[in-house]
Swiss-Prot record:
<dbReference type="InterPro" id="IPR008972">
    <property type="entry name" value="Cupredoxin"/>
</dbReference>
<keyword id="KW-0336">GPI-anchor</keyword>
<dbReference type="InterPro" id="IPR041846">
    <property type="entry name" value="ENL_dom"/>
</dbReference>
<feature type="glycosylation site" description="N-linked (GlcNAc...) asparagine">
    <location>
        <position position="41"/>
    </location>
</feature>
<keyword id="KW-0732">Signal</keyword>
<keyword id="KW-0449">Lipoprotein</keyword>
<protein>
    <recommendedName>
        <fullName>Early nodulin-like protein 6</fullName>
    </recommendedName>
</protein>
<dbReference type="GO" id="GO:0005886">
    <property type="term" value="C:plasma membrane"/>
</dbReference>
<dbReference type="GO" id="GO:0098552">
    <property type="term" value="C:side of membrane"/>
</dbReference>
<comment type="function">
    <text>May act as a carbohydrate transporter.</text>
</comment>
<feature type="propeptide" description="Removed in mature form">
    <location>
        <begin position="150"/>
        <end position="177"/>
    </location>
</feature>
<dbReference type="InterPro" id="IPR039391">
    <property type="entry name" value="Phytocyanin-like"/>
</dbReference>
<keyword id="KW-1003">Cell membrane</keyword>
<comment type="similarity">
    <text>Belongs to the early nodulin-like (ENODL) family.</text>
</comment>
<feature type="signal peptide">
    <location>
        <begin position="1"/>
        <end position="23"/>
    </location>
</feature>
<feature type="domain" description="Phytocyanin">
    <location>
        <begin position="24"/>
        <end position="127"/>
    </location>
</feature>
<keyword id="KW-0325">Glycoprotein</keyword>
Length: 177
């Protein structure tokens, strides 16, 4: 009976380690990508998409676009849809931005008129949790977000996490023998 408790504890530790080191890559806008909203009633599609996802420190946002750009700006610049000194400017058709801190990130298109038409987005990154309240779920996304696999991709923050987990399991198994 004591051996079973050790195995269960080891499995819990393994899941906890993976939850700490895994991050998610999101495709901005989901299946639609980083595009100009097609009509005025879609002007908030990016913020609606962002509000349906849970972003953590270490996650990344991939912006895919053609003949466009993406800028990371301040809140004031976001509201005005203009900037002279963006934190990031990219027009390479495929831009990946790492969410490196908790808080708000403001994104706008750098093409004249696109931001005013709704090609802008606010992403809220969650505070880092110091201790888990319960075992981590299999995914931090709502079930509806799993419909399109190309919009969200799990990745690993570092390769060592797998080795740590395997080591814990091997040590546990050999300690029971």
């Amino acid at each position: 009976m004591g051996g079973q408790k050790i195995v269960l504890l080891s499995i819990f530790v393994c899941f906890y380690v993976f939850s700490l080191v895994s991050c998610t890559e999101f495709e901005a806008g989901g299946e639609n990508g980083w595009i100009i909203p097609q009509s005025s009633n879609q002007s908030d599609i990016f913020n609606q998409w962002a509000s349906k996802n849970r972003f953590k420190v270490g996650d990344t946002i991939r912006f895919k676009y053609k003949k466009d750009s993406v800028l990371v700006v301040t809140e004031d610049e976001y509201k005005k849809c203009q900037t002279t000194k963006p934190e990031l400017y990219s027009n390479h058709d495929d831009t990946v931005f790492k969410l490196d801190r908790p808080g708000l990130f403001y994104f706008i298109s750098g093409v004249s008129g696109h931001c005013e038409q709704g090609q802008k987005m606010i992403i809220k990154v969650m505070e880092v949790e110091s201790t888990p309240q319960s075992p981590p779920p299999s995914s931090s996304l709502p079930a509806s977000a799993h419909k399109k696999n190309h919009a969200v991709r799990k990745t690993s923050r570092f390769l060592g996490a797998g080795l740590v987990t395997i080591s814990i399991l091997v040590i546990t198994v050999f300690s029971l023998v």
